[in-house]
Amino acid sequence: MFDYESLRLIWWVLIGVLLVGFAVTDGFDMGVAALSPVIGKSDTERRIMLNTIAPHWDGNQVWLITAGGALFAAWPLVYATSFSGFYFAMYATLAALWLRPLALDYRSKIEDPKWRKTWDYALCFSGTVPPIIFGVAFGNLLQGVPFELNEFMMSKYHGTFFALLNPFALLCGVLALMLFVMQGATWLQMKTTEELHSRARNVAQITGLIAIALFIIGGFWVQSIEGYVITSTIDTFADSNPLNKEVSLQVGAWMTNFETYPAMWTAPILGVVMPLLAVIASRFERGGFAFLFSSLSNAGVILTAGFAMFPFVMPSSLNPSHSLTMWDSTASELTLGLMTGVAAVMVPVILGYTTWTYYKMFGRLDKKHIEDNDVSAY
């Protein structure tokens, strides 16, 4: 049905969609978890916050699991190289993700302030660490990752965990955290009442403005970073072999795609305008629009990074010609074809049941809801 080149492009788009879906849905879960000990001033308020995400958090995590599975199947070399290079960071992320269901399930089992406060901080950790690590990972991808391939296409990573925590990557990590917290705050503005609602509204406005500032700073910063350019001819229909190309480093090269394809400027414009609209909507008590604009903010930032790097997926700072691109590090044509058929069925199913759950379980929560469901609620 599709040729090899088209399948490669389709899966670049699909993985991008899965990452955006994760940021939009699991983003507000993590944002709420990060905010729970910050703006929840009483046990009841914190329970209200957690129960706004109770019907959705496990379903939202499907986006991340699916993205990981798609990365493994569609880009196996990228999967292997990234997990070996970001090994400690990946385990820190998984530890935080494992901690979240434990904290949600065990927090309300014992009516002891110290017990519940401990789990509140565990939830904050589970909502803060993953977005920072994801942002740091994207920041390092834009700078290049120190790996190389041998003749058997086996990757070897030459960096350290602390080398990943460079200034630009940390800026990207804080930006990701602000976007997720804004997502959580706008969600709470839609779902809560009274003082908790007001605090969430204030947080949404503050984090939105910080996100705009960080994104603009990052945009100017990336223009001074050495980007990657393919200088040889690459056969987009050939079997995957990252060693069959030449790549050079050029300062400001990540801006080339925006100059070549002006339509791509839509993404960074979204990354600046949508947080501003989210702040305005939040200020004027339009919670639904604030959440929508916050979601589009996440999409705009992710798309900006993807468009800037295209067709690179994982550049190598150690040996630029060993960089992994969407044209030479994918699975076979047969595998991509079979996966496309599966995705054509499963992605609409995921979208369908996700939409249905939000529709059926929409509404604001208040103290009365927690009191009436004291045993069953988180």
Question: What residues fall within each predicted segment?
Answer:
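Juxtamembrane interface elements at the cytosolic ends of transmembrane helices
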Residues: G27-L35, W98-D112, F138-M153, V174-L196, ...
